[in-house]
Amino acid sequence: MLQRTLAKSISVTGVGLHSGERVALTLHPAPENSGISFRRTDLDGEMGEQIKLTPYLINDTRLSSTIVTDKGVRVGTIEHIMSALSAYGIDNALIELNAPEIPIMDGSSLPFIYLLQDAGVVDQKAQKRFLKILKPVEVKEAGKWVRFTPYDGFKVTLTIEFDYPVFNRSSPTFEIDFAGKSYIDEIARARTFGFMHEVEMMRAHNLGLGGNLNNAIVIDDTDVLNPEGLRYPDEFVRHKILDAIGDLYIVGHPLIGAFEGYKSGHAINNALLRAVLADETAYKWVEFSNSEDLPPAFHDLNLKKCG
């Protein structure tokens, strides 16, 4: 299977979830073997240089997965666009923005899926590299854990736990095996969510200024405040899977393995990536020159070529 990039550049504007400011975002094609890179067009000189994404640049995970370079350049809330890039198997792209934060759009990855569909996706000449998990790797923190296990495909299982009545109306656990399920149908529409008391607290600290009922599910003590309700009965846990897929794709390559998590979040997801990469016996790089040898979870990528 070959690497892929966008067929053409495409732009969109939106609002930063935390800054509340307008953000102009452009996705560009990029050369093979260049990976996913970001560039802040509002910064000059070295601060405005291209940043090649790696797990080691995620140095702020308090509210999202945020790039912080050694020069202090920030690119925040990258997990939703990374999740969409993962769904389309984009290996190489340059993402330019004129603000410190990717726009939140509607709180899901669906607007970014539409962007990729509009831009088109094309194969390149170099072989796509997959990161294959060879043995279990687990990271535990207080009251939460995540792990990779070997699996001939890509499967994600997550469990959430919140002490609010609204979360008791659906299962706290969701599992998706991409050998038989579609990311676009099952995951892409799930929106980020937050609690009313947290919204008030964040705004008091000049955070969450761009959040509203059009780009997040807002929950009070007992119910969902969005008049249209939920897009999936278990939208909360599905969004956590959307986030996890984006967090894991920060490694820059599709993963062959099973990911499980209990109360996972951006920090522990990133810690798991780093733990895998730190142990050379835990993984290997693989290529598939014959697409018939691809694990079934990645067959759908062959249907997503256009341009």
Where are these regions (language model features)?
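C-terminal regulatory domains involved in ligand/effector binding and gene-expression control
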Residues: 1-91, 96-307
